[in-house]
Every structure is written in C-alpha cells, then in structure tokens.
Amino acid sequence: MAFRAQFENHNDIGVFARLTNAYCLVSLGGTENFYNVFEAELSDSIPVIHASIAGIRTVGCLTAGNKHGLLVPNNTTDQEMQQLINALPETVKCRRIEERLSALGNTIVCNDYVALIHPDLDSETEEIISDTLNVEVYRSTIAEQALVGTYACITNRGGLVHPQTKIEQLDELSTLLQIPLAAGTVNRGNALVGSGLVVNDWVAFCGMETTSTELSLVENIFQLTDSTKSTNASLRDAVVESLS
C-alpha cells in the first residue's frame, strides 16, 4: 500500500524521513498526524526513530541507508549518534562520513544490494558506502542530474526515477540494478521523486498532493498492490525475523 502524508504543510516526505526495511527515521518537530501515519504502518515491524542530524530536521536529505547500515554526515553530534545507535537494530551499522557533499540523501540512492552515487563523491566515501551498506556502488546520473537521491527512489522490488529519463537509460539502469524501473512524478507532477516519496519493500509514503494516478504508479512499480499483499507480508516478516 501507499499512503499520503505531510510534514508541517510540506509534501516533501523524503526530506523529513528515511525509510528502509530495517528502520525508519522521522524528523523531530512534526505533527502527531505525521508520526501516526508512519507508526500505524511500521511500528509492529521496524523501529520508527525520531531524530535530528546536526540539529537539523531534514533527516531524509542528510542520511542514506538500507537494512545493513545508516550513513550520516560528519557534523552529526555525538549525542545524536548515540541516540541513533541505541534505537537502531543491532545488525544495522551507523557510520559518519566526512564528505564535502554532505547531503547524503541527495547524493546516494540505494536498496539492500546496490547503490547509485553522485559522480563527484570522494573515493573514500565510495568505499565507506560499500562497506557500511554492503552494496555494489556505481557512479551515475539520472536524466543528466547528478543528485541521484533527489531524482530517484529504489527498493529491492522496483524503482521510480525522474520523468525525463530516456528509455535507453531506464533499460540500462534496470539491468544494472536488476529491478523494474518507471519514469514518473509525485506531488502532482513534481520530478523530485526522491524528495516526495519514501518506500521500502512493503509500504510507501508520498506527499499529500500526490494524485491517484501517481499513487497507482508507485504501488505498481514497487509491487505494493493488493495482488502482492501476501508476498509483501512474507517479505516484511522475513526481514523482521532476520533483525531479531
């Protein structure tokens, strides 16, 4: 299923949340309705962690992660790091990265097996991403945009990318990532799909302005429809069991 939500009248859900198969980060300071949408769907399966990064609420922009790990910028405080480590499942590694392009959520997009990264990230950053997230790493652009995390969102089951992505690149990326991909939008025609959407292998959250057509594409490409509901439940249960 896919659900709509808002963070203090902002529809850029991906700016204020980071969702994986093992945990969900949500920004401090949101409304109860915002938190309730996430906790109602996730709290029985994975921890929903209220967090800030360097005192900033845009946790989705600043972090990248999957079921294996969480990457945060170097200016994350010691207190914030400790809170994250305490709240995350024991199997999830949490690592600071000293990187000039510190909005990691904008420069990295990943699932549990592979990551696409901004072409200009440091080579040391690339190694840390590979080691912490346990993924194959590829430098790439999407529709000639270097901010791959802003213009794409992927899971182990599918991905949504910038609406102007050419068919040839869609095919290339789909082969590379080994998942089906679609070019599309969220929030009524917004190309910033990574900013307007968070999704894991069984549930998605979009901004309130996301249309029914956009929501349907999200549910289909990420295989979240009713026809895959039992499969999604099995996936969720398997992931949760592996984390316990």
Predicted regions and their residues:
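The feature marks the mature, well-folded catalytic cores of soluble enzymes
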Residues: M1-S244
